[in-house]
Amino acid sequence: LTIFGNSMPISDTDILIARMGKVLRYYKNLENCPATFQRRVSTVCVNYLYTALCIRKIDKYVSETMALIRTLPFDDRFGLKILITQYFEDMRNGDKKSMQQLKDVLRHAGLTKLANRLQNES
């Protein structure tokens, strides 16, 4: 998982898609996995969403990746990842108002650098 997550920016698109498909199949019941796996897989998922939507402009496995992240609890471990996933879904759907609201929430919470980074991706 670590190697896959770190190699996303330089991976061939077909390899990226194939590996993400394997992650989704292997961890389809992520909510039943140990917390360490949940954290790592959810990080890989968010990185995939960023890479797929913002860099590669591909849609393969995006819905499935979002659905997998949403199986996790909205708590201090995964809440931010769920919010970022919502941002990417809003971006995908062209909902600029909701995107701006999420960025405003992040700024209000002191996560200005993250909000600004998302700003550059919209």
At which residue positions do the language-model features occur?
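C-terminal regulatory/effector modules of DNA-binding transcriptional regulators
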Residues: 19-122
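Hydrophobic, aromatic-enriched interface-forming segments
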Residues: 1-30
